[in-house]
Every structure is written in structure tokens, then in C-alpha cells.
């Protein structure tokens, strides 16, 4: 990813999306937490796990948190303390993830590269973040998207049900990890346009990929590179895929089954290493 060559300029500002998408989020209902981001995983609120991970990564300079609502902060004293101390900059969330991301970006200097992730990434580790960003920095692109192979998830977590994008060159699972240079920020605006069409799926597919790419997908000929090239052409942003080796990168906590899996993975790691070190 093309950024200024000076090492200091290669530290990223992180934007974390932390708002509930619905008033009936299954994780919130199951755990009784004030919001999804506060739901405990391994006894620690998900949002605190993510913030701890970003703090431990030497490629992250600042953290901006979009949501949850300020009225809920008393329900997570550790988060409230970090906001009050200036460790984290909090912003009210907007009415959609893309608009929240856009608001977060507006508070970051244009010459600062950005990492975008989510508060429900409970298994995120400093090593995953570092690997993603280091790979992104070596690529000739404006935006990088993290992914793991469907096979890696199936092998590591048998029975785990994940949404896998199946293309000619394999199955892919997104990781909710995105990196942008200044030019790459335009991808968030493209994302917002796609969100506005979410109730019109075929028009959405046509706008995001284009007719030729859709035909290739239908006939099983679409590869990841062709898909990214189609999105790059439509958005005007040069996008590249960063394949990550750690299958935990593809596990976010959206459903109760995800929560149980994350708890099991954390328990397995603690038991095998005698430590909760997330590296």
C-alpha cells in the first residue's frame, strides 16, 4: 500500500465500529450486555479485547471508536476510563456502518493510513493486525482487504459455519480488516452507495461487480483477482487482497454459536499455553 516512506508515517490510525446494527442483536440478548460490544468473551468485554489488541500493536498510533452510544458507557467502566484518559477517541455512531466509518475517517489527517475493524472481532490478536498491516504496506494498492481461506477455517474449526465466498480459485472468508491510504478512503463512499442498495440485491451486485463479473460468477469462472479488479474499476480505488494464515482472523462474534466457538478457542489457547497472551 502506497504511503509516505518515513517510518513514522507508516503507523496507522485505527477506526473501530462498535454500534449495534439492530435493537435485537442475538449476542446482546443472550448475554444480557448493554450492547453487543460489551458482551463478555472469556470474561472480557469484546470491545476491550479489541482495544487491548490495537494498543499492543506497534503499527497503531491512535484509536477512534465509533459507538456505542454515550448513554451506555457507564455499563463498561474500563471503556469509560480509556475514553476519559484519552487512550481512545469516542465518536457517536451514525445510522449505518459505512457512515460511521466515514465519520471516523473525517477525524484522521489525510496523510495518515487507516486500519478499519469492528468491535466484535473478539479473537483479533496483535500478531494478526501486524501481519495484515505489514503485508498491506508491501502492496501496490490504495486499499487492502483481509481474508482467510475457507479451508483454513474448516480445518482448524471443524463444524464451524461461516459465510464463505466461493470463487474459482477457492473459498474466502473476510476478516473485517481493511487498510486505506488517502486515495483508498474513497472506498468507504462506494461502500455507502452499496449499503443504500442493500434491499435491491441484483442491482447491488450489478453496481458492485458489473455485468461481466456477475456472469463469470454464475458460470463458476470468477476468481478473486477478477472480482477485486471489477470492484476497483467501479470504485476507482486500487484494491488488493491480503491472505492471512491465522484462521482466527475469520471468526467474528455475530451469533450465539460464534460466541461459544470464541470461548472454546480462548479456553483451548489458555489451557495449552497457560497464558492469555494474545500475540
Regions found by a protein language model. Name each.
Residues 1-32:
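N-terminal nucleotide-binding beta1-loop-alpha1 segment
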Residues 31-49:
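Short catalytic helix/loop segments, enriched in acidic residues and glycine
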Residues 53-60:
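Short, acidic, metal-binding catalytic loop of nucleotide-sugar glycosyltransferases
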Residues 67-73:
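A conserved acidic beta->alpha catalytic loop
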Residues 78-113, 123-124:
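Short phosphate-binding loop-to-helix
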Residues 117-119:
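Active-site acidic Asp-centered loop
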Residues 124-233, 244-248:
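Conserved core of the sugar-phosphate nucleotidyltransferase
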Residues 255:
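Short, conserved phosphate/pyrophosphate- and ester-handling motifs at nucleotide-, phospho-/glycolipid
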Amino acid at each position: 500500500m502506497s504511503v509516505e516512506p518515513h517510518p513514522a508515517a507508516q503507523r496507522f490510525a485505527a477506526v473501530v465500529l462498535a454500534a449495534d446494527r439492530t435493537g435485537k442483536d442475538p449476542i446482546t440478548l443472550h448475554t444480557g450486555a448493554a450492547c453487543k460490544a460489551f458482551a463478555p468473551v472469556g470474561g472480557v468485554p469484546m470491545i476491550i479485547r479489541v482495544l487491548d489488541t490495537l494498543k499492543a500493536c506497534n503499527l497503531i498510533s491512535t484509536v477512534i471508536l465509533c459507538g456505542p452510544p454515550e448513554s451506555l458507557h457507564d455499563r463498561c467502566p474500563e471503556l469509560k476510563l480509556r475514553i476519559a484518559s484519552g487512550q481512545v477517541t469516542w465518536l457517536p455512531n451514525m445510522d449505518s456502518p459505512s457512515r460511521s466509518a466515514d465519520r471516523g475517517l473525517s477525524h484522521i489527517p489525510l496523510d495518515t493510513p487507516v486500519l478499519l475493524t469492528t468491535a466484535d472481532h473478539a479473537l483479533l490478536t496483535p500478531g494478526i493486525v501486524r501481519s495484515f498491516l505489514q503485508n498491506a504496506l508491501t502492496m501496490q494498492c490504495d486499499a487492502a482487504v483481509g481474508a482467510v481461506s475457507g479451508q483454513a477455517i474448516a480445518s482448524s474449526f471443524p463444524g464451524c459455519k461461516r459465510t464463505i465466498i466461493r470463487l474459482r480459485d477457492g473459498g474466502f472468508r473476510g476478516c473485517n480488516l481493511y487498510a486505506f491510504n488517502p486515495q483508498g478512503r474513497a472506498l468507504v463512499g462506494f461502500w455507502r452507495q452499496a449499503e443504500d442498495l442493500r434491499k435491491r440485491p441484483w442491482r447491488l451486485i450489478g453496481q458492485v461487480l458489473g455485468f461481466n463479473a456477475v456472469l463469470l460468477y454464475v458460470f463458476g469462472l470468477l476468481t478473486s483477482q477478477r472480482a477485486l479488479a471489477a470492484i476497483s474499476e467501479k470504485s476507482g480505488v486500487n484494491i488488493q487482497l491480503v491472505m492471512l494464515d491465522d484462521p482466527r482472523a475469520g471468526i467474528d462474534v455475530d451469533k450465539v454459536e460464534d460466541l461459544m466457538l470464541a470461548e472454546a478457542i480462548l479456553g483451548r489457547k489458555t489451557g495449552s499455553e497457560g497464558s492469555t497472551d494474545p500475540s
